[in-house]
Amino acid sequence: MSKRALISVSDKTGLVELARGLVELGWELLSTGGTARTLIAAGLPVTEVAAVTGFPEILDGRVKTLHPKIHGGILARPTPEHLAQLQEQGIQPIDLVVVNLYPFRETIARPGVTPAEAIENIDIGGPAMVRAAAKNHERVGIVVDPASYNEVLTELREKGSLSPETRRRLAAAAFAHTAAYDAAIAAYFQRLMRNEEPFPASFVLSGEKVQDLRYGENPHQGAAFYRLPAPPPGTLAGARQLQGKELSYNNLMDLDAAWNLACDFKEPVVAIIKHTNPCGVARASTPAAAYRLAYAADPVSAFGGIVACNRPVDGEMAGAMTEIFLEAVIAPSFTPEAMAILKSKSNLRLLAAGERAGCRTREYQIRPVSGGFLVQEPDYHVLEPESLKVVTARKPEAKEMADLLFAWQVVKHVKSNAIVVARDGVTLGIGAGQMNRVGAARIALEQAGARAKGAVLASDAFFPFGDTVELAAGAGITAIIQPGGSIRDEESIRAADAAGIAMVFTGIRHFRH
């Protein structure tokens, strides 16, 4: 009796070549719908599943393979009892199942797709066959990825059958395939129901490997980069690398931090990042001007940094960036002139992320902890000027207010405890990741130096004492923005009034760990 392969695929890549190879090896082909039509058009002998089951496809193709003559043929073990039952029921064994599933993830990635369209692309029969074959991998081969076709054909030609090790490996890939598929469906429905249940009882997460990384944060740590199902344009996972060396784990961490910061602004902004903290951020009328200001904010730290711009990189900005060593640049796009200039920096990694809107579509932030993970909403809070509360005798002037709002937007992207000193839409000093707030302020003010005179200061959380205000006053800071809410707020307010500093409370905290 010849061996039988059941083939039913949405992705027709390599289909005809695989099927022809199986026929040449003497295999009988079973197939359904569009797959069968493709094989017949290629001149290959095919038995349609309906001829095996004696039952036609029904319900617009929703029911094709859900039949004992199919699943019995897949699930039967090579035992005398099972083989006898197959013979009694007139069922022939199926030895190889080649299935990939309806393009659900591709469907939900389309702009404007409706729930009805998404639901129609939820495969039922396909996952059932995949799981059945994977469960019975002791006897049955299961192939879900066209990239495996050549390997399978080669082994069948050389050995006549698939080894137990190969079948086990293919089964593992098949179970991962259906798990990721179901996870994408679950995530889609969670998204639809998010207003009713923002944190579901079961949180499903899956990813598709983009690439193995050379190592993790350190050379002794392994690492890989995974993409969530159907990432929208404007995200790091959806970005295209245009040139440069292979991305590292640390590159990706810094690129994400830089891109999220730059995209938080509507006007042209450039952010330069080191170890996920900004070292220079500036807004200006053009990308090139913003880059020069961001670089000048801290040229020492900018060396070897990651740059993000929320506007297309043009030739002028590209030329400015060639003057120092940078690890990577991410932007919506790069003009042809910019690409021609940056080509001389062949190791510089360039990423085109597409439209900026996508970088604010992250639904959850997920952090691993021992034995589990934490989930929270992203910090996308936008501060409205009218919500600010002036708590000092002096109100901020218009120019000070503009700088306060700029510094406040930057400080939420700095590791806590965080202090940002800024003036004219440029950061002058950033104190990040300190165990006490006055220590963060001291770092930011020392970095700003004489430039702190006439500048503003932003704090990601309230001042527990008046010492930070006193330190700011001594450096010449004229206005402060902070959440407020300390039991000693009056101490900070008195210190500000004594120095003639304008201070506003936001009522919102921006801790970042």
From Swiss-Prot:
The keyword Hydrolase applies. Its EC number is 2.1.2.3, 3.5.4.10. InterPro entries: AICAR_Tfase_dup_dom_sf, Cytidine_deaminase-like, MGS-like_dom, MGS-like_dom_sf, PurH-like. PROSITE patterns: MGS. NCBIfam families: PRK00881.1, purH. The gene is purH. GO terms for biological process: 'de novo' IMP biosynthetic process. Residues 1-144 form the MGS-like domain. The keyword Protease does not apply. HAMAP family: PurH. GO terms for cellular component: cytosol. It comes from the Bacteria. Pathway: Purine metabolism; IMP biosynthesis via de novo pathway; 5-formamido-1-(5-phospho-D-ribosyl)imidazole-4-carboxamide from 5-amino-1-(5-phospho-D-ribosyl)imidazole-4-carboxamide (10-formyl THF route): step 1/1; Purine metabolism; IMP biosynthesis via de novo pathway; IMP from 5-formamido-1-(5-phospho-D-ribosyl)imidazole-4-carboxamide: step 1/1. SMART domains: AICARFT_IMPCHas (SM00798), MGS (SM00851). PANTHER family: BIFUNCTIONAL PURINE BIOSYNTHESIS PROTEIN ATIC, BIFUNCTIONAL PURINE BIOSYNTHESIS PROTEIN PURH. It catalyses: (6R)-10-formyltetrahydrofolate + 5-amino-1-(5-phospho-beta-D-ribosyl)imidazole-4-carboxamide = 5-formamido-1-(5-phospho-D-ribosyl)imidazole-4-carboxamide + (6S)-5,6,7,8-tetrahydrofolate; IMP + H2O = 5-formamido-1-(5-phospho-D-ribosyl)imidazole-4-carboxamide. Belongs to the PurH family. This is Bifunctional purine biosynthesis protein PurH. GO terms for molecular function: IMP cyclohydrolase activity; phosphoribosylaminoimidazolecarboxamide formyltransferase activity. Transmembrane segments: none annotated. Keywords: Hydrolase, Multifunctional enzyme, Purine biosynthesis, Transferase. Coiled coil: none annotated. The IMP cyclohydrolase activity resides in the N-terminal region.
